[in-house]
Amino acid sequence: MAKSALRYTPAGIAVLEASFEHVGTVTEAAAERTLTFEFSTIALGAVAQALDREPLGKPMLLEGFIAPRTRRSTRLVMHITEYKVTD
């Protein structure tokens, strides 16, 4: 995980932008396929504050939703609504 500095909106809501790396194996058409990729995330409020306190490099299970970065963007970003550190 790489993260930017915790910032606040004019309304006082905490915002944390970060990128994560996923490494996993899936089965597609009866063949195993290894996936390795980075993806962008954003967290708001208490989740952003808690995630900012986590050390880099810990395995995590993320929950949330995927949405365009902005209204007119074709780039996607995952909005983290919950996370759990896994060991």
Describe each model-derived feature in a short phrase:
Residues 1-87:
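Single-stranded nucleic acid-binding surfaces, predominantly the OB-fold ssDNA-binding core
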